[in-house]
Amino acid sequence: MADKKEPKITVAAENRKARFNYAIEDTIEAGIALTGTEVKSIRSGKSTIAESYADSRDGEIWLINANIPEYLQANRFNHEPKRPRKLLLHRKQINKLMGAVEREGMTLIPLKLYFNERGRAKLLLAVAKGKKLHDKRESEKKRDWGREKGRLLRARG
């Protein structure tokens, strides 16, 4: 039999601090409505989603404060770098996310911006709750203990 190939996913931007600053409850994949120059700029790998978040307006989910810099070769047809971008989701998904945000006090934060195997730009969106300082310290201690435990087990045998 022929070997099945793994889907080729190209990560363009990642929010590394999100897992430290937030307790992630659920993740969901969303498409993004982009212009041509935005897609080219993301492919060049210079976009950042670290300070961004998602919010609901008029029954739709929007990505706010994501920085996709201008594409240098586009001269006057360029886009605005920090404009709000519409996230493409099904109505059931939107209702679920809006319910979590309004009732449970959760936040929608982007974890990863990537291109799927078909070349479409996707955003991995997390439903999360912000951690307090003592929660961050506790998770850091737990992570450090896991590393130390691994080192001890490797050293012994």
Curated annotation (Swiss-Prot):
Q: InterPro entries, from UniProt?
A: SmpB, SsrA-bd_prot, SsrA-bd_prot_CS
Protein's cellular compartments: Cytoplasm
What's a single GO CC term here?
Answer: cytosol
- Lineage: superkingdom: Bacteria
Annotated stretches, region: Disordered:
133-157
PROSITE patterns associated with the record: SSRP
GO molecular function annotation: RNA binding
Q: Where is the composition biased (Basic and acidic residues)?
A: 135-151
Endpoints of the signal sequence: none
Q: Which GO terms describe its biological process?
A: trans-translation
Which SUPFAM superfamilies does its entry note? Answer: Small protein B (SmpB)
Could you tell me which CDD domains the record lists for this protein?
Answer: SmpB
Which Pfam families does the record cross-reference, listed alphabetically?
SmpB (PF01668)
State the UniProt keywords alphabetically. Answer: Cytoplasm, RNA-binding
- Task performed by this protein: Required for rescue of stalled ribosomes mediated by trans-translation. Binds to transfer-messenger RNA (tmRNA), required for stable association of tmRNA with ribosomes. tmRNA and SmpB together mimic tRNA shape, replacing the anticodon stem-loop with SmpB. tmRNA is encoded by the ssrA gene; the 2 termini fold to resemble tRNA(Ala) and it encodes a 'tag peptide', a short internal open reading frame. During trans-translation Ala-aminoacylated tmRNA acts like a tRNA, entering the A-site of stalled ribosomes, displacing the stalled mRNA.
| Similarity comment | Belongs to the SmpB family.
Descriptive protein name: SsrA-binding protein
